[in-house]
Amino acid sequence: MTVFASTVTSEQAVAAFAPQVKGRTFVITGAGQPSIGSSIAIELAKASPAHLLIASRTAENVHPVITAIREQDPSVKATFIQLDLSNHDSVRRAAQEILAATKSKIDVLINSAGNMALRKYTLDKQGIEIQMSVNHVGHFLLTNLLTPALLTSAKSPYGARVINLTSVGYQISPVRFDDVSFSDGKTYDMWTGYGQAKTAQILFAYGLTDRLKDRGVVAFACHPGSNLDTKLGSHLVMDDYSDVLPTTKRNTGQEFSFTVGDEPRFKTYEQIGATPLIAALDPDLAGRGPAYFQNGEVVEPVARHAVYDKGEVDRCWRLSEELVGQKFEY
């Protein structure tokens, strides 16, 4: 794969892989402004994609992004799809709208929507803890419902890809298979909830690749880098982050690591979309995986519970099927 500097920007990543953008269809979740998803969408618009679909809760949040895309290139088709990942009825409706709008052909799905370290214990409509719901379970359902469209594009020269945005926060906790919703809140911890959800997204990427790689679809889990410019952690204060290290140690017995190699502790807003874009576009990655990306490259997760293990991967898949009430077999 192409090697980039640790300070590579989203713009540079798109420029390097412009042929892998031109004429292709991308679906991005959670791309309200400002967010990692919106930065990715706006940069992709510079390289002449055929269609950018942004799935988010409210049109108001996405309108500035659609406007920015059209300013980049008025010929790029940009579509808003209403999606509430915490409501499975909404996910199913959104999937049908996306399939119709794309004529059942999607080249790249980027699952970038999410929430982080919510202080108040909350359940979604289905009774699932809200961080697990939005970060993982809703995306699991959406991705599987869109898989027929990904398989159609899998026949193209570049294949099809799914990018799950995870976080170094995965280190905080493994998936709590026997108690994903914290005993109705009695044992809830906001960072543990975030950690298990981000671990689940890694295991999901592994599981999807296991099932579909031979048919031309691969999924990668990506930590985009830490950044304070998006709305993701806007409800937190710096003291909240002091709980990350002891919570990780308590849950896993391991130390928490913020970076790998020469990765900056914080990436700029211009850099924050680069790693997922590299994973989505680099043609040398076709047929590769399962894999986890950080700092623009494939790395081994530092936490034992996120290293590929088929038993754990399949266990997460089965749990996710139970939570959405539907089996997906390929």
Identify the function of each model-found stretch:
Residues 6, 256, 285-330:
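C-terminal tail/cap regions
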Residues 46, 280-284, 325:
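Residues at helix-coil transition
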Residues 210-288:
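SDR active-site lid
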Residues 92-95, 269-280, 310-317:
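Short, amphipathic alpha-helical "lid/cap" segments that border enzyme active or binding sites
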Residues 3-239, 330:
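Rossmann-fold NAD(P)H-dependent dehydrogenase/reductase core
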Residues 147, 205-209, 276-277, 317, ...:
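Non-transmembrane alpha-helical segments in soluble domains
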Residues 61, 130, 275-278, 289, ...:
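Residues within well-formed alpha-helices
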Residues 188-195, 259-266, 303-308:
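Active-site rim elements
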